[in-house]
């Protein structure tokens, strides 16, 4: 019985060695035909963690789970009219430029306001802008930019405005059933692999439509067919909530609106998280406002009555004064922002303030050494 078991083990080992050799030969042939890295063991990948780029909003980064938009993936931002979709996308553009990247904006709606984009922090002199005439042209331009590997972020505004050439050339009233959906499906087939390979973030802004005859359930849907829904790694539902009243002489005027951003699909972190942000008219997302709220909830900023304090120092009476303090003191803003991100595991605990102190100390030590050397030379 023991002999039989030993023989069976030898046969199994021999069979296993043959299979491994066959697999190695197959991998070599695939690599020869399709290039290095066409097939690899997951453990051999240099980077297994998904790389992200901040959305430009701390609250949204937390809701996304990974700390921002995943690189090499497709993101869809949709919602009702004037809900803040383009604002959210423009903050991503500003963030990409802030990190030294190149961003492109495909303006299919022909409605981008350069002054508003600049107010949100976008460097309009460096922004690549395209306003094509048809949906096919929009997507071809986006594809060429992505294929170049030189662009970090591409925003398409919006999918609903990607009108097929056949519809543009036709007469009003002509039926063009499924043309846009077919165009989007073909675009997703072509773009997805290139987006992943070049680590480009592709943001598609979309509108809402109502399904006719729906009696039960949600009648809302997005145009462009189902392809974008399937290929998107992240889908954000942006909804404006209540209006924000001004203070002082502007107390009777609406100066912004509270906006809810729900992550309805997320392939890199748990979905269905929500972010609540303040979108101020003419300014975009209030980064100081969201930081004060989140840091206060974590007790990084202490609140006693109407006063806000940080590290034992009062920074303002009322949220508006606290916002002004953080806006006037960017170093304190960055320090608090870093602590919040460390708390949520979005960055390692290497305080930028501490790093600056170490750098200053090293510069001081170098200066002392230079002075000592100068004294020795004189002697």
Swiss-Prot record:
Subcellular location: Cytoplasm
InterPro entries: AAA+_ATPase, DNA_recomb/repair_RecA, DNA_recomb/repair_RecA_CS, P-loop_NTPase, RecA-like_C, RecA-like_N, RecA_ATP-bd, RecA_C_sf
GO cellular component, one term: cytosol
Ranges that cross the membrane: none
Alphabetical UniProt keywords: ATP-binding, Cytoplasm, DNA damage, DNA recombination, DNA repair, DNA-binding, Nucleotide-binding, SOS response
Residues reported in the UniProt entry to bind ATP: 79-86
Family to which this protein belongs: Belongs to the RecA family.
HAMAP family per record: RecA (MF_00268)
Record's protein name: Protein RecA
């Amino acid at each position: 019985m023991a002999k039989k078991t030993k023989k069976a083990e030898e046969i199994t080992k021999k069979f296993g060695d043959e299979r491994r050799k066959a697999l190695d030969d197959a991998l070599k042939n695939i690599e020869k035909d399709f290039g290095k890295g066409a097939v690899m063991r997951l453990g051999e990948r240099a980077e297994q963690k998904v790389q992200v780029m901040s959305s430009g909003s701390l609250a949204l980064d937390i809701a996304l789970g990974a700390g921002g938009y995943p690189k090499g993936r497709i993101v869809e931002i949709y919602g009702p009219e004037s809900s803040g979709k383009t604002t959210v996308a423009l903050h991503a553009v500003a963030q990409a430029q802030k990190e030294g990247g190149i961003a492109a904006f495909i303006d299919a709606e022909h409605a981008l306001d350069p002054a508003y984009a600049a107010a949100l922090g976008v460097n309009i002199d460096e922004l690549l802008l395209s306003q094509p005439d048809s949906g096919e042209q929009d997507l071809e331009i986006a594809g060429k930019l992505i294929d170049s590997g030189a662009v970090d972020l591409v925003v398409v505004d919006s999918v609903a405005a990607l009108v097929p050439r056949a519809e543009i050339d036709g007469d009003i009233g002509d039926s063009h059933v499924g043309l846009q959906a077919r165009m989007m499906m073909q675009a997703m087939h072509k773009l997805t692999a290139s987006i992943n390979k070049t680590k480009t973030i592709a943001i598609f802004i979309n509108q809402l439509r109502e399904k006719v005859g729906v009696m039960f359930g949600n009648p809302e849907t997005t145009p462009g067919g189902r392809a974008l829904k399937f290929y998107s790694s992240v889908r954000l539902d942006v909804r404006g909530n209540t209006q924000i009243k001004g203070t002082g002489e502007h107390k009777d005027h609406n100066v912004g609106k509270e906006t809810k951003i729900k992550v309805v699909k997320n392939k890199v972190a748990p979905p269905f998280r929500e972010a609540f942000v303040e979108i101020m008219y003419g300014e975009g997302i209030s980064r100081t406002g969201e930081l004060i709220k989140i840091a206060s909830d974590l007790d990084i900023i202490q609140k006693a009555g109407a006063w806000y304090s940080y590290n034992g120092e009062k920074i303002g009476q009322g949220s508006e004064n606290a916002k002004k303090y953080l806006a006037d003191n960017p170093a304190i803003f960055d320090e608090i922002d870093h602590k919040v991100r460390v708390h949520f595991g979005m960055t390692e605990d290497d305080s930028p303030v501490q790093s600056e102190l170490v750098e200053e100390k090293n510069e001081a030590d170098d200066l002392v050494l230079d002075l000592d050397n100068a004294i020795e030379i004189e002697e």
